[in-house]
Amino acid sequence: MKKVLLTLAVIVAGLSVTVLDINAQNKSGKTKFQQEMQKWHQDMEEFRARSAERREINELTDSIAGVQAAAAVLNRDFVLEADQVTFKNGNTVFVNSSTTFISVKGNRAVVQISPSNFAAGPNGVGGVTVDGSISGMQQMVDKKGRTTISFNVMGIGINAQIEIYMTPGTNQASATIYPNFNSNTVWIDGNIVPYENSDVFEGMSL
């Protein structure tokens, strides 16, 4: 009988130790999981803080660029550097902003469309360059703060009306070029920068 009781006592003691070990493991597992979750939450908070800081920096950069662009337009001393051109047939081409642009310097405008990186074109840089005198320049701001600049350009190789639309608070802009003697309208998208800050390369004019 004593032997049986002793055996039972050993078994119970073993079970108790096993239960304690399991509880300890569960507690350790929970603690590790809680630590991992806490670290994840901390990482997420740091990520959100960095993202918010980057957004603020980007917004500030856009705002400064927008102010500079607005001043340059007002002074007739700007370049719309294009990164995308859309033709009348709907084809859209991504272009080099240093070779596709509209520049305004005082009463002179240059329109250069260079959609090709493979063919030299008439201007030597993959497209066409035309320049001329500006007339009838107007600047309008609507109720939503969107600015539209319109003017005519007349020269040996160009006779067109140009409308430029500026995105409020940034230097982003798009333009429509309406030739007066044909319907080959061209649309470009890009950014407006002060003339002296532009690094465009002007090809040979027609």
Model-identified regions with their sequence ranges:
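Solvent-exposed coil/turn segments that connect beta secondary-structure elements
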Residues: 83-85, 105-107, 114-116, 154, ...
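Mid-length scaffold segments of soluble, non-membrane domains
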Residues: 92-146
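Bacterial Sec-dependent N-terminal signal peptides
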Residues: 1-31
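Helix-rich interaction surfaces within compact, conserved domain-sized segments
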Residues: 26-37, 137-206
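Well-ordered beta-strand positions
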Residues: 72, 103, 110, 165-167
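N-terminal leader/targeting segments and the immediate start of mature chains
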Residues: 34-89
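Short beta-strands and strand-coil junctions in structured, solvent-facing domains, enriched
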Residues: 87, 118, 158-161
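Residue-level detector of beta-strand structural context in well-folded domains
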Residues: 69, 100, 162-164
